[in-house]
Structures are given as C-alpha cells and as structure tokens.
Amino acid sequence: WDPIVRAIDGSPLADPASKVHVIFVPSYLDDRDGIFDKSYYELLVGMDLTLFPSYYEPWGYTPLESIAFSVPTVTTTLAGFGLWIDRREEHPGVAVLCREDGNDDEVASALADAVLRFSQLDAARVEEMRRAAGVLSKEALWSRLFEAYEEAYALALDNADVRMNHVASNATPLPEQQVKLVHQALRPERPEWNRMMVEKNLPERLRPLEELAHNLWWCWNPGARDLFEEIDPDLWNRSERNPIAFLDLLTINRLKELERDESFLASLDAVYAQFKSYMSEKPDPATPKIAYFSMEYGLHASLKIYSGGLGILAGDYLKEASNKNVPMVAVGLLYRYGYFTQKLSAQGAQQATYEAQNFSKLPISPVRDELGNWTTVQIALPGRTLSARVWRCQVGRTDLFLLDPEGTIRFVKIGYLSLIHISEPTRRSYIS
C-alpha cells in the first residue's frame, strides 16, 4: 500500500543487477530504529550527498544542517533555504532545482541529473565541494542573520503603522485587503446552554501524582513516565500518555489499591522527592533573564500547540533552559485546534482530521491577579483590540505563558468537586 514501495516495485530500481540500490526505512532515526541503530546526525556525516527536494518548506533546515556538516545537498525553490541560496551568484555545494506545482517530471529528471553529475566527480573535486558546502553554511550563522532580522522587523513595524493609520470606523479597506466582520447575537428567547466539567480529586496519599501530571517535567524524566505507566499500562496507552486524562480515568478501586501498594508508594515518594529537589533550585538572580517567543512549542503529544520540527526545537529550548536553570520566560499561543492528524484514504491520499483540545485535560492553569481575576492582555490590531486570556504551562522550572482569545471561563468550588463553568460571550465578532 505504500506509494514509495509501489513506485519501486517493477521499476529498474528493483532489479538486483542495478547499480542503484534503495534502502527505504520509514522510521524515526533515534539510534533505536532497528535497522541502522544510529542517530540522524551519525548517518548524515557518512553521506556523500543529501537530497531534500521539498514541495514546500518555509525555511527547511535539513539541507542547511547537511552543509554545516560539509555534506553537499540538493534542495528546491519551494524551500526558503533554496530561495536564499539561489539568490547568490555562486553556491558550490548546493544544487537548487526549480520546482513548481506542475513540473514533477521535470524535477525528477533534474534530480537524477544532479546525482549523476555528482557521482562522476573525482575525489579532489568532491573534497572541494565538501569544503565549499561547509564554508557556505557559515553564511547562515545567527551573527550574520541578525542584522537582516532587525531590518525585517523594522519593515514589519513600518507596515503595521501604515495599516493602523489607515483603518478607521468608516475607512475604505485597502484594495489588497479582504476584511469582513460578521456579528452574531444570541436571541434572548432561545435557551443558553453552558457546559459543566467535573474534576476528580485524588486521595491525599496520591496527591503528588496530580502535581507531577501538571508539570511537563515528567515527560523528559523516565522515572516519572514509568511511574504513571506502572499504574495501568493499557489505560496509559489508551489515554495517549496524557497523565491528566489518565488520572481522571482511574477507578476508585484502583486508587484504593495504590494507596495500599507499598512498592508503588515508595516509587512515588522517590520520584516526587526528585521533582521537589529539582524545582527547589533557583537561578542566580544576577543572571540575565530571557524572554522567548514562538508560534508553536512541541513539548509533548498531549499538548497540541505545534506542527513540526521547529515546534519541537522550541520545546527543547524550554526543557534545556529548565535543566540548565536559565531564567527564561516563554510566550506562545493556545490553539483550540492544534496540529491535524494525518490519515490515508483507501486510494493512498492524505486526509487531515482536526480534533478540538479539551483544555481541562491539559497541563495548563489560569494566570490570576492579586484579586483572583483571570489575567488578560490586550493586543492592538488595525481598527480593533484583541483580548486574550493568559494560561500558564509549567515546563520544569520554565514558565510558558499561552494566550487564548476564546470565551470566558469561571472556576467554581463545590465541596470536593471542582466545577468549571464555561460561559460563551453573548456577542462575537468573526473575521474571515
């Protein structure tokens, strides 16, 4: 059923006598894949040439990584990196193919030609190409790119000023703008439905599990992960390894069993003591503080506020800052619909499925002011102001503040139950 396997079967590539052999390993290269058992970078440095013929990449850091390791590469004009390279008069070590929506056959032929040309180079020329690739990668060092970043940021501010000055209540939209405000008012004669969600409280002896579940420290510490899985391996997998959802699904009988399980309680106490010791360490007050902004953070699959590798990279920065005890504060966006789930149809076509996140099952909590009010921030946009509530996500010692522009939520305590009352605003503005 795999389209790559189908394309190879029956082609000259499947001929044992062919000089070209394909090793197709659709696996994450984490040194435990069962085929190579080496990390991506260990394999990368052993390559003669890498191919990244992207159909779309805002930047595409894989070919840049390749030349940083002095491995020549092939990319396309549909990758930001490819466009950046192609603007240079000379770029030895990087071949850039012109790719468009309808020229797949042309790109395939050009890709084959690029591989053939490289294979015909003598050893001296290959070594020259490798050195040139390494030198070219230095052009992308942050020390060089930061000046261009400042220019781009200044240009964005200038353009924002133009829009702010143009937009008024009776202003005519710019020709290139298509802004439509749709107001929806609730009818007073119709019933208003509100959602109620019940949160369970764990027995006192097991309360540390709740604290661990609400700090993502657990997701990169094997002892904490194993602790949750030990409780009920099948349920842990069914809850998609989300400890908050997992604890909500535990039966009262299982909780009582855990309260009497001395071996489990000893493991819980050990992990909790490790966590408290970790959290008690504070950064040096004299250390410069860092504010980190990103559109996405890949911290764990249960918190769907990322879509790819750059989000994972941003998430790793937060975890590393926590481990290094760097005083960093991160700011991002809380998406109701995170990354989509990919499925394949019977014909092999990719289908995207979007699932709404249940915020009550996420390791986030409202940020409140000294009066107990939910903290909100106002962001000035052309012709309007956007209000967003602030949530806090604890990533070890690092605080991640997530902005959420949806309706208001009110927490109500009734006995041992925590009820979350969600009230939608009576009037909304939609932009399409």
Cite the ranges covered by each PLM segment.
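Short hydrophobic beta-strand element within catalytic cores of glycosyltransferases
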Residues: P72-T76, G82
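Extended, charge-enriched "interface" segments that sit outside catalytic cores
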Residues: V179-K282
